[in-house]
Amino acid sequence: MKKRVNIIIPAITINLELLKCLKEINKIYYSNFFVTIVLNYDSKIKIPRFKYKINKLLAGKINMSKKRNDAVKKFKSKYIAFIDSDAYPNPNWLKYGINYLIKKKADVVGGPGIPFPKQNYAEKISYLSKRSYFV
């Protein structure tokens, strides 16, 4: 039986980047997961239906670390996966990550952030600069 995973996404509010992220999560090749989005404030933008459950937690204006911690405490699961609202996962992300955790008896698995494929030049530069150790 697949272990349950809580994918936690901290964000300021529901926006187009978050909706893209949720759409890509819908393509994951792993069935036993749910998503928790942790927001500063609610939005009038509706979240479409996906094949997975989405929990929404309104946390107010707090930092991303606190948002992640609050989501871990509120919505329990065997495993926790973090992703930013401006990123999207490889479809095998959870499958490979969980297999690695089990086989290697590891506690943490990290992975690359993948930018959206159709970003314009300015968006790509912004994405790369946010992830650079030299900035």
What is the predicted role of each segment?
Residues 111-112, 126-135:
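Short, flexible, basic/aromatic active-site loop/helix in glycosyltransferases
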Residues 84-88:
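The conserved acidic donor/metal-binding loop of glycosyltransferases
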Residues 80:
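Short aromatic/hydrophobic "clamp" motif used to bind/position activated sugar donors
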Residues 1-24:
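N-proximal low-complexity "stem/linker" segments adjacent to membrane-targeting elements
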Residues 43-50, 92:
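Acidic helix N-cap motif at the loop->helix transition within catalytic regions
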Residues 92-124:
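Conserved donor NDP-sugar-binding/catalytic core segment of glycosyltransferases
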Residues 59-75:
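Glycine-rich, basic loop-to-helix element that forms the pyrophosphate-binding segment
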Residues 23-32:
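Short, acidic, metal-binding catalytic loop of nucleotide-sugar glycosyltransferases
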